[in-house]
Amino acid sequence: MSPVKQRLLRIAVSHNRHPSLSEEQFHQWATKEHCARAARIHSRHGIEAYGMLFSPETARTTVQNLNRQLGGRWKIDEHDVTVEFYLHSLDELTSVLEDPEFKALQQEEEPYVSGEDIVATLGWVETYVQDGRVVNVDSEGVPTYPGFGVLADFSSEQVNQK
């Protein structure tokens, strides 16, 4: 019997840039001044992976065109950036949020990030193709992840204990 896979969570938080900034100015600030500092803090608290998905107007127009070609059923997200955290427990993120260095870094965001219309999503990741290869599927073609009941159980997360 193979060991049970540890669930990998993804929490994504979507933001818009401050209206006084161009997309390029926002990207410059995020990549040159913010991300590397944030990455060191996230790593220190056990975050498995951290990244930012930038979605400028050119990308949104492109996905709108794709959506139109596919029948127009998608709702296109209009946010400028989505911050992605991959972790095994929300305790890791809570630890980051309580870190004084991170709190100071968040204070510096105010002139760059709009505080309006922030959207968050939380779920787990099931990867089936990685590095061009099929993964996490056994020889019978069955996924090797635990069942839904195990994966969907968030009751042990500290935020649900309070």
UniProtKB/Swiss-Prot annotation:
InterPro entries: Dimeric_a/b-barrel, EthD_dom. GO terms for molecular function: oxidoreductase activity. SUPFAM superfamilies: Dimeric alpha+beta barrel. Keywords: Oxidoreductase. Pfam families: EthD. It comes from the Eukaryota. Residues 19-113 form the EthD domain. Induction: Expression is positively controlled by the cluster-specific regulator ATEG_00326. Its EC number is 1.-.-.-. Putative oxygenase; part of the gene cluster that mediates the biosynthesis of isoflavipucine. The PKS part of the PKS-NRPS ATEG_00325 probably assembles a triketide from an acetyl starter and two malonyl-CoA extender units. The poly-beta-keto intermediate would then be fused to the leucine unit by the NRPS part. The resulting amide would be liberated from the PKS-NRPS through reductive release of the linear PKS-NRPS product from the enzyme complex. Belongs to the tpcK family. This is Putative oxygenase ATEG_00329.
